[in-house]
């Protein structure tokens, strides 16, 4: 199954809808990236909420437009809160997205993520090693770092998407987005995106928010990847290194004009 190149014209159209809806996105993410994740969503026009207590997480997940579960700094108490939120989202038909950070390297989070799959995520976003591990095809990876190219994990992503009936995103130099039947590729970005903490985690939040949009989920999620790739390219051109990249990236998201970028390329 050969991937198709995602259309930037569609990404521009989707961004207009995203900004108009401003999806309320419940982010249960890791401690390292909370601020950057919230700022990424705000820059694009979404409304982030970082509700993590088990007592509050369950009811809030039911009223949010989307939920993100990121297991980067997972603890037993946080797993309890995440499970409560996912169950609530499932009952309320709120789309939720799983970011299985380092799932192949640590047994506790691997079992937790596998258990959550029965509650039908709308999307899963991970690097190649994480997707391979979650699909059961391989274990390993260096924590949050991947040891595989995204394309190598594409068959696993397609199989996982069919098994769970969801969208699976494998990120790398080229991102691949699949529903198991159709696959889209999104090139672009810049190596500087890998030299700061949180771009992948922030993408997962944007993917989660995009799942709240009407229309084809595959196209909406691929559009989310496209926005982040374009902003990364722009930010890299305007920065001198990781320290100046972060504010440039947030500015690029805020001013993102996919149609103009499409004309330039």
UniProtKB/Swiss-Prot annotation:
Q: What is this protein called?
A: Hydroxyethylthiazole kinase
Entry binding sites for substrate: 50, 198
Lineage start: Bacteria, Pseudomonadati, Pseudomonadota, Gammaproteobacteria, Enterobacterales
Which NCBIfam families does this entry report, sorted A to Z?
A: PRK09355.1, thiM
> Which InterPro entries does the record associate with it?
Hyethyz_kinase, Ribokinase-like
Please give the Gene Ontology molecular function terms for this protein.
ATP binding; hydroxyethylthiazole kinase activity; magnesium ion binding
Tell me its family.
Answer: Belongs to the Thz kinase family.
What is the organism of origin for this protein?
Salmonella schwarzengrund (strain CVM19633)
User: Which EC numbers characterise this protein's activity in its record?
Assistant: 2.7.1.50
Q: Where does ATP bind?
A: 125, 171
Give me the reactions it catalyses.
Answer: 5-(2-hydroxyethyl)-4-methylthiazole + ATP = 4-methyl-5-(2-phosphooxyethyl)-thiazole + ADP + H(+)
Q: Which GO terms describe its biological process?
A: thiamine biosynthetic process; thiamine diphosphate biosynthetic process
Query: Keywords on this record?
Result: ATP-binding, Kinase, Magnesium, Metal-binding, Nucleotide-binding, Thiamine biosynthesis, Transferase
Record function comment = Catalyzes the phosphorylation of the hydroxyl group of 4-methyl-5-beta-hydroxyethylthiazole (THZ).
Q: In which pathway does it act?
A: Cofactor biosynthesis; thiamine diphosphate biosynthesis; 4-methyl-5-(2-phosphoethyl)-thiazole from 5-(2-hydroxyethyl)-4-methylthiazole: step 1/1
Cofactor list = Mg(2+)
């Amino acid at each position: 199954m050969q991937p198709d190149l995602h259309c930037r014209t569609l990404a521009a159209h989707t961004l207009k809808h995203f900004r108009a809806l401003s999806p309320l996105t419940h982010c249960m993410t890791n401690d390292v990236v909370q601020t950057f994740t919230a700022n990424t969503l705000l820059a694009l026009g979404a409304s982030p909420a970082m509700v993590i207590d088990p007592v509050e997480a369950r009811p809030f997940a039911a009223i949010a437009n989307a939920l993100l579960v990121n297991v980067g700094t997972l603890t037993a108490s946080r797993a309890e809160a995440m499970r409560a939120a996912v169950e609530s989202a499932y009952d309320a038909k709120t789309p939720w997205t799983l970011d299985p950070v380092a799932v192949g390297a640590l047994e506790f989070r691997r079992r937790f993520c596998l258990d959550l799959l029965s509650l039908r995520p709308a999307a899963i976003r991970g690097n190649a090693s994480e997707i391979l591990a979650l699909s059961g095809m391989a274990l390993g990876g260096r924590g949050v770092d991947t040891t595989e190219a995204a394309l190598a994990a594409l068959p696993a992503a397609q199989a996982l998407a069919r098994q769970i009936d969801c969208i699976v995103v494998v990120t790398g130099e080229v991102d691949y987005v699949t529903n198991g039947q159709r696959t889209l590729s999104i090139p672009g970005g810049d190596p500087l995106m890998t030299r700061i903490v949180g771009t992948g985690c922030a993408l997962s939040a944007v993917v989660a928010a995009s799942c709240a949009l009407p229309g084809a989920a595959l196209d909406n999620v691929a559009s989310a990847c496209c926005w982040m790739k374009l902003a990364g390219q722009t930010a890299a051109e305007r920065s001198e290194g990781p320290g100046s990249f972060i504010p440039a990236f947030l500015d690029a998201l805020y001013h993102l004009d996919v149609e103009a970028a499409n004309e330039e390329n």
